């Protein structure tokens, strides 16, 4: 809990492929672990090793998942997406985040041999919507750089490991 006069920790919506492929699950776990330094990760289940390649199961089915994710997206202060593994869902989430005016960081690994969609790379404006190329070994450094440079007012009270 933030002390009086401090801002509450950041709420982070993390996007990563679920039904589009789980090849990057271990990387997602590293990303979510690092994001926890900066606040509450609303979608940490994306990094869960138990989440099957066929995707999430919920009592309410796909419609429940859609509504829950949109609610979390509206609550989020920032959106972080790992976009190397192509995913229709991640693209949809990013479009909705843009419409909501959320700050967005997309992370892409060119070494994967994939080419990032022009609809993602072309949306980058150098401010509200960022697309950063990175190597897997530097993901934590990239996240630290983003949160310290672009969201310092939100992370000042939550950048220590116990947050």
UniProtKB/Swiss-Prot annotation:
Query: Where in or outside the cell is it found?
Result: Cytoplasm; Nucleus
What's a single GO MF annotation on this record? 5-hydroxymethyl-dUMP N-hydrolase activity
What Enzyme Commission number(s) does the record list for this chain? Answer: 3.2.2.-
Going by the UniProt record, its keywords in alphabetical order are: Acetylation, Cytoplasm, Glycosidase, Hydrolase, Nucleotide metabolism, Nucleus, Phosphoprotein
Expression by tissue, per the entry, reads:
Highly expressed in heart, kidney, liver and spleen. Weakly expressed in lung and skeletal muscle.
Give the highest taxon in the source lineage: Eukaryota
The record's similarity note reads: Belongs to the 2'-deoxynucleoside 5'-phosphate N-hydrolase 1 family.
Specify the protein name: 5-hydroxymethyl-dUMP N-hydrolase
Q: What is the species listed in this Swiss-Prot or TrEMBL entry? A: Rattus norvegicus (Rat)
From the UniProt record, report the name of the gene that encodes this protein.
Answer: Dnph1
């Amino acid at each position: 809990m933030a002390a009086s006069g401090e801002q509450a920790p950041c709420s982070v919506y993390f996007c990563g492929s679920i039904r589009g492929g789980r090849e990057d699950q271990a990387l997602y776990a590293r990303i979510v672990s690092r994001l926890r330094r900066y606040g509450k990760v609303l979608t940490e289940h994306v990094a869960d090793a138990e989440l099957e390649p066929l995707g999430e199961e919920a009592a309410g089915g796909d419609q429940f998942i859609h509504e829950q994710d949109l609610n979390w997206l509206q609550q989020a202060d920032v959106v972080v997406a790992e976009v190397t593994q192509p995913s229709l869902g991640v693209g949809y989430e990013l479009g909705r985040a843009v419409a909501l005016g959320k700050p967005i960081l997309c992370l892409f690994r060119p070494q994967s041999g994939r080419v990032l969609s022009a609809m993602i790379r072309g949306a980058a404006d150098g401010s509200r919507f960022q697309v950063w190329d990175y190597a897997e070994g530097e993901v934590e450094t990239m996240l630290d750089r983003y949160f310290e440079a672009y969201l310092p007012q939100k992370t000042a009270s939550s950048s220590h490991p116990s947050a």
